[in-house]
Amino acid sequence: MLFRSGAHIISIGTVSATLVHPREVFKFAILSNAHSLLFAHNHPSGDAEPSRDDIELSRRLKAAGQLIGIELIDSLITGHDTFTSLTERQLI
């Protein structure tokens, strides 16, 4: 689903996991002629701390974006009334 703001739902998962492939993340960025991308997802638990998988995926997205010329600006994790920026934490 593409939103008017340019936001797009890539995957809907379960309470504890979802599958995300960089190809799907960048598909709509490429089709939209985007030069940058902000990746965001939620943790239904409400804890916005990044998991090892969150960090690994974000690093893969950053590397993929560098290859195709679309900058990953940040990877955000939302929780209950809070969020975590992996860029701010220097994790990507």
Regions found by a protein language model. Give the residues of each.
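Active-site-proximal loop/helix of nucleotide/amide-processing enzymes and allied scaffolds
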Residues: S11-I92
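Hydrophobic structural segments
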Residues: S5-H8
